[in-house]
Amino acid sequence: MEFPTRFDVIVIGGGHAGTEAALAAARMGSQTLLLTHNIETLGQMSCNPAIGGIGKSHLVKEIDALGGAMARATDQAGIQFRVLNSRKGPAVRATRAQADRILYKAAIRHMLENQPNLTLFQQAADDLIVENDQVVGVVTQTGIRFNAKTVVLTTGTFLGGVIHIGMQNHAGGRAGDAPANALAKRLRELPFNVGRLKTGTPPRIDARTVDFSAMQQQWGDDPTPVMSFIGSRDEHPEQICCYVTRTTEETHDIIRSGFDRSPMFAGNIEGVGPRYCPSIEDKVNRFADKDSHQIFVEPEGLTTNELYPNGISTSLPFDIQLKAVRSIPGFENAHILRPGYAIEYDYLNPQDLRHTLETKFIQGLYFAGQINGTTGYEEAGAQGLLAGINASLRARDQEEWYPRRDEAYLGVLVDDLITMGTQEPYRMFTSRAEYRLILREDNADLRLTETGRKLGLVDDERWQKFSEKCEGIAKERSRLESTRIHPNTEAGERANGYLKQPMTRDQSLAELLRRPEIVYDHIAEIGAERAEDPNVADQVEIEIKYEGYISRQADEIERLRKNENTALPLDLDYDVIGGLSNEIKQKLKDVRPETVAQASRIQGVTPAAVSQILVHLKKRDLLKKQSA
């Protein structure tokens, strides 16, 4: 049958990418359908019960700055919060939260069920309806046809999913869920480059069978950091302790004894796994000189005994898993509630996408999340948000939007994927961003919330809090610049108490704050006044202390923006451009870069080749500027 309502946007999949995509499109006013195989698993944390971390929290904050759900759900579900790299510079500081799976899923579902313009429907999608290279709808497993102007695919690990435990394997999208085989078959019929990747998860442990006294305690920060720019510590549930233990040489011997029955070593798994989250058998094999590996023992929630042993993801046979777990200090009598497993699944080459995450071959079709070769909730959520935004814009015939590399980690993520592709699950790190001093976790709202407001993503409550923060920053910055301290005053004596070289002339509080030995708390004592909002104080301190570095990065960005804004026609014939080697021509044809700057980032494309392209465009009057 044909469903009576025609939608602007259909989102397939209710994981972290799908929920952000659906919420974004609906917030912008598009009539949106979220199609999921099971409404009970909306927002489910399929692997580790945590949000954030190095590079990842930057994405969470950017999602939040654009009105997304992930940070708000984390504040409502976080049972331990920590700031990582707190002693390092502001560019690499990152917030990480341990989350209660049940509370997190409930928070996401509440947002979905109470979002205007959003309809939920439980059915697996089996087919895409494509007419004249344009997607026009979806057909479900029971033959229901949903018509729409745009479709966002966020299929996670479900496309052709195969679960491996030892030499046994079976079809599955994750433990307990069927794979999306019909949809996987349909995508292979379309002009996409399909590959295989794999990921894994550790066995879950019953906390009642664990000796925590044999482990090191790891408490969160107090006071707890807040994930959302509009969040509050009052939202945080009870805070709990995590634990740390380590594998032993006995553990490694047991693991090695199972190598002959490991699907990874036996060649049963063709997909490449995540480099930065390897299985324990991979770690033991690759780092044979190490006699132990760290394991973070993370409770999965306040109302469950289930523990997540972070660091021992595995697809070894269950008998080996059990022996290995029980050789670890504190786990001698451990009961495994769920065995660890590896899952292999289809992904599509992200070089087949545009920066908006729309496919190059089929108009109105967008991909987000693990289907694009990424790993991680945060990477998925950020892509989902961007895909939802652009699906909504296209459905209303409005100009597309995406952030540049100098505007957001989301811009770095997408540009990396579509420019270089990926042969392994892609994870975000701060080191991937060349402008990381500008793309800090703390200023994601200053970078993106105004854009989010223009796009219709940011509600009045968030906009008011953002406006108050901006006003507070301007006011405090002005106070620090205008308040002068004289050496021969009481305030001057207080200042000299912190300085290695005493003041010889009067200085503003801002000048003093630029001195390496002075921090904002000192300034508050010297000036006998401080900003009421600690977020304002942090922002002002960073802006003033790192002003020179930030200014230099801004100048570099301005120089490069000329090429970033020079568009390349997607149908440009590289074969007729003189001076390009066949290798460079092929790389350009494979990627089909959208801008001159993107072309310059393709491995092997030389500055001379970029110059030849510019000359060709100028001769044929094809030079165009874009505003994205």
From Swiss-Prot:
Annotated residues that bind FAD are located at: G13, G14, G15, H16, A17, G18
Give me the residues that bind NAD(+), please. Answer: 273-287
Compartment annotation? Cytoplasm
Checking InterPro entries in the record gives:
FAD/NAD-bd_sf (IPR036188), GIDA_C_N (IPR049312), MnmG (IPR004416), MnmG-rel (IPR002218), MnmG-rel_CS (IPR020595), MnmG_C (IPR026904), MnmG_C_subdom (IPR047001), MnmG_C_subdom_sf (IPR044920)
> Which UniProt key words apply to this protein?
Cytoplasm, FAD, Flavoprotein, NAD, tRNA processing
Mention any one GO cellular component term assigned to this protein in its UniProt record: cytosol
Q: Which domain of life is it from?
A: Bacteria
Which is one Pfam family of this protein?
A: GIDA
Question: Record keywords: Flavoprotein included?
Answer: yes
Query: What cofactor requirement does the entry state?
Result: FAD
Residues in coiled coil: none
Query: What coarse category fits the chief subcellular location reported for this protein?
Result: cytoplasm
Quick one: a GO biological-process term for this protein? tRNA methylation
Q: Which family does it belong to?
A: Belongs to the MnmG family.
Q: What does this protein do?
A: NAD-binding protein involved in the addition of a carboxymethylaminomethyl (cmnm) group at the wobble position (U34) of certain tRNAs, forming tRNA-cmnm(5)s(2)U34.
- Assembly with partners or alone: Homodimer. Heterotetramer of two MnmE and two MnmG subunits.
Q: Which HAMAP family does this entry report, sorted A to Z? A: MnmG_GidA
PANTHER family documented for this protein: GLUCOSE INHIBITED DIVISION PROTEIN A, PROTEIN MTO1 HOMOLOG, MITOCHONDRIAL
Q: What is this protein called?
A: tRNA uridine 5-carboxymethylaminomethyl modification enzyme MnmG
